[in-house]
Amino acid sequence: MKGFQIQQKGERRISAALRIMLVVVLLAVQIGFVVAISYFMQEYLALAYGVVQVGALFLAVHIYNEPGELSYKLIWFILLLLAPPVGMILWFLWGGAAQKRHLPRNTKRFPDEPESVRMRSEIAVDKLTRQLPAWSRTANYLCRRDFQLYQNTSVTYLPEGAILLRNLIDRVAKAERFIFLEYFILAEGKLWDELEKILCAKAREGVEVKIIFDDFGNIKRFSGETIDRLREVGVEVFIFNPVHEYVNRLHFNYRDHRKIACIDGDVAYTGGVNIADEYANIIERFGYWKDSGVCLEGDGAWGLTASFIRMCVNLGGVMHNEHDYYRPHTPVKSEGFCQPFTDGPQNNPDNPAEDVFLQMISGARRFLYITTPYFIPDESLMRALCIAGDGGVDVRLMLPGKPDHWYADCVAESYFGELIKHGVKVYRYTPGFLHGKSIMVDRVAAFVGSVNMDYRSFELDYECGVMVYGAPMIESLLEDMDMIVDHSRLVTKEEWAKRSVLRRVFEPLLRLFAIWM
């Protein structure tokens, strides 16, 4: 597929550092050329520049009328106002319509759900409506977007990256039919060395092994030599949205941020955990790395397996077996319901992830606990949290104490005053970096997945997650959240008011560009 070419084995590769340098230099030359032409037009071609200004005005009107967040459009308005030629050229290169031409469109809807699966989902929704009527709306909302509701699924909450990754590697070692991995980051190191040996051994045994990873997330961390080794033994590797040196083919946005692992159809994992040493605290980055995820065993695993297959097929992959081969084969009996779902920019402006979050916030009556590494809310999300706080809901927002990006943290902190004013408790996880993405409501519903509470996750990146209703794992999640609070510092209004003058000056400026963080 154009814009998403799969690099073939034997293709000449260069080191990550040289590759980055080449891309940066070529981009600088191209952007410099654009700026030079713009100023030439401005100084010497008044008539042409007037035409450009009129064109910029029409483009601004077009952008305003497109669906989407006004905060995103505001950046383009400012750019078109300050430098019309540059703004127009950048929009046509990197604006919404230009970049979306290169997105996988899910035009190949393999695998199609048989009527029996849809019927079981409808039966599950009816049962959920009787048991937990407050959550039937969310379940129906996702079902209408083709994300089925499952029973007969054991959902295990995994409160640490090290626990999840050890569990995953042990399961991969037992695989008999297939192993599917889709990750934003696959980083070479101790964890990868162990996993690679198992993957190669399984491929030699005839197990179907497929890997999807995002090129931008791995440009310095996953070498061409590693890809060659995998392909030599039969592992199929697909590179999502390769970083390109030409500006019209370079996509800063629309990355594959999902974390999905599927083994033999019966087991699937998702959450915030990538495959890299820092996620298991083998190496230290930003203090203690606190992450989490879930393991699905049973019917619900199919929701994540099907999502992987759709992405793989849209990247040019071929599924070597019939549909039923990839479905769960081992029956499981368990309490509660689960509903895996995915999100991506092709859905805009209908974004399941943000819509689900808003429904969870508005549905809270007693407790609303949230963990997220990045908090850059839009107006609707911010308003919903404030309404929940004003309504007497115990709202707790848990964020990193040692953030990885100071500018994103600065933007998040700018919202604290308003949240605290409306009764929301904001906590900073003091041991280090809190990377888990989870929501718990009233001890009856929960979300765990890859979705951050920011514009990038809601609008620009491919994401995934699982809604869980009435399952025992919710208590495990609550226990972990209580532990996080015990190891966190409550942010007070007085402390927030004492932040530095420099930080206060930068906050409104950074908010303008928050959508690209």
Regions found by a protein language model. Give the residues of each.
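Histidine/acidic-residue-rich catalytic or RNA/ligand-binding cores of hydrolases
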Residues: 380-382, 409-411, 441-444
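Helical hairpin unit composed of two closely spaced alpha helices linked by a short loop
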Residues: 374-396, 400, 405-407
